[in-house]
Amino acid sequence: NILEREKQEELLSAVQPYIEEKKVDSIRLSTRPDAIDKDILHMLKKYNVKTIELGVQSTNNYILARCKRGHSFEDVKKASKLIRFYRFNLGHQMMVGLPDSTEKDDIQTAKDIIKLRPKMVRIYPVLVIKGTELEEEFNKGDFTPLTVGQAVERSKEIVKLFEQKNIRVIRVGLQNTDTITDSENKESEVVAGPYHPA
């Protein structure tokens, strides 16, 4: 979901005193590719945002539609170009093992991302989380997530591609968060998939 503009400005305003006091250097945020336009970028520049990461996930329009992402590869290209034009640091986030996505599809996504010239990327494996549509598909046998080994091998090949083009890989895999672990009872919310707490 995209935050309302008023809420965005409220949150960004709260950080400004820390930037003025040099306690915080800059702001980094993640958003959907279809949330980026010139007006938003003007506003983000005003609030000292330096890095914008786009949740690309895949560059295959069929896979994006299959996963109900709500954006297209055209949205990714347009947003990436605008972000670079406005001189923000551009980051991309991609996922490996999306429904109907093959290793070839994931490699192609990495190659497409390279052409868009982000400074950094994050690579996340798809996990089946409790209470999601993907859990329903998994329970019906309509989705099989990657194993840890498959995710590592696939990610390894993708990391090599990025490193050959001097694009920093700043994360591979998800960090342990309240989304993954129920904060009250510390039970995992992960039903299946290549999750390793390391």
Regions found by a protein language model. Name each.
Residues 96-103, 120-146, 167-197:
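Flexible glycine/acidic-rich beta-alpha junction loops that bind and position SAM and/or redox cofactors
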Residues 23-25, 161-167:
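Structural alpha-beta junctions
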Residues 1-120, 130-149:
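Conserved non-cysteine loop/helix-boundary elements of the Radical SAM core domain that shape
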Residues 142-164:
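Alpha/beta-hydrolase-fold enzymes
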